[in-house]
C-alpha cells in the first residue's frame, strides 16, 4: 500500500525512507479500507473532523494527476484485476 500510495504523490509529500505510517498514510489507508466519512476517521484516529478534512485536502492538492480522481486512485491500490 505504502509504495503504491507514494506513487500517487509528488516527491515532497512522500514519506521519507524508514518513516512510520504518518497521519496522511493512516487516513488514506482507512479510506482504502472503505471508511470514507471524515467524522468516522476523526473518531478512529482521535483527531478533529477539521484536521482530517485539512489533511485530505492537502494531500489531494499535492497529488500527481487530477486531484478530483485521487481518492478513486487510492481505492484502486492493491485491487486484484479479474
Task: Please place each PLM-identified region on the residue numbering.
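Cytosolic nucleotide-binding catalytic cores of signal-transduction proteins
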Residues: 1-82
Amino acid at each position: 500500500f505504502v509504495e503504491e500510495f507514494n506513487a500517487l504523490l509528488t516527491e515532497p509529500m512522500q514519506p521519507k525512507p524508514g518513516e512510520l505510517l504518518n497521519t496522511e498514510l493512516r487516513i488514506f489507508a482507512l479510506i482504502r479500507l472503505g471508511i470514507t466519512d471524515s467524522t468516522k476517521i476523526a473518531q478512529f484516529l482521535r483527531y478533529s473532523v477539521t484536521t482530517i478534512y485539512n489533511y485530505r485536502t492537502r494531500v489531494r492538492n499535492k497529488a500527481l494527476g487530477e486531484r478530483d480522481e485521487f481518492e478513486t486512485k487510492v481505492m484502486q491500490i492493491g485491487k486484484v484485476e479479474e
